[in-house]
């Protein structure tokens, strides 16, 4: 499928060590999912990458239903990863990345902070909730949610 933006490609969203290990074909197979991945990338991830100034690594992007349901993943049946509306971005300092996304006013649906990555989702064509959530495993600093700092 090729390039989405100057720093992201569809293959990055399809790449999955878990899928490879268990012989699961994890390929974006519908235009609807492809368009959702494109929208997430162009509206949230590429602007974040531009502001961050360093590469962003996708740990988990698109997940076919079989991969999402695999015990090694344990994804929710309603996961936005299945729809192409979510990506988990590796971060040595997840709160710094999340704070930047918040301060930029990026139109995310959910931003969930984990110890080693940040989950970003964006509902294709839908209203975005702008939720900042923390996985129970995350014990670090919290995002400063100040409306004066948020541009969006």
Feature locations, PLM:
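Extracytoplasmic cell-surface/polysaccharide-interacting catalytic and binding patches
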Residues: 1-51, 138-152
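N-terminal start-of-chain detector that recognizes signal peptides
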Residues: 31, 59-63, 91-95
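Glycine-rich, flexible loop/turn motifs
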Residues: 4, 67, 78
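Extended, low-complexity, intrinsically disordered C-terminal regulatory tails
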Residues: 42-73
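Catalytic cores and adjacent binding grooves of peptidoglycan-active enzymes
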Residues: 78, 82-83, 87, 91-152
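Generic detector of well-ordered alpha-helical segments enriched in charged/polar residues
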Residues: 34, 38, 68, 98-99
């Amino acid at each position: 499928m090729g390039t989405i933006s100057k720093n992201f490609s569809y293959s990055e969203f399809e790449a999955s060590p878990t899928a490879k290990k268990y012989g699961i074909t994890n390929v974006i197979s519908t235009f609807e999912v492809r368009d959702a991945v494109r929208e997430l990338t162009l509206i949230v991830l590429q602007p974040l990458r531009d502001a961050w100034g360093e590469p962003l690594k996708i740990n988990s992007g698109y997940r076919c239903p079989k991969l999402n349901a695999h015990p090694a993943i344990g994804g929710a049946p309603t996961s936005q990863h299945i729809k192409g509306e979510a990506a988990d971005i590796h971060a040595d300092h997840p709160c710094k990345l999340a704070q930047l996304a918040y301060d930029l006013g990026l139109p995310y649906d959910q931003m969930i902070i984990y110890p080693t990555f940040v989950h970003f989702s964006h509902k294709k064509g839908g209203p975005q909730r702008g939720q900042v959530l923390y996985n129970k495993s995350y014990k670090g600093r919290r995002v400063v949610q100040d409306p004066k700092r948020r541009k969006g």
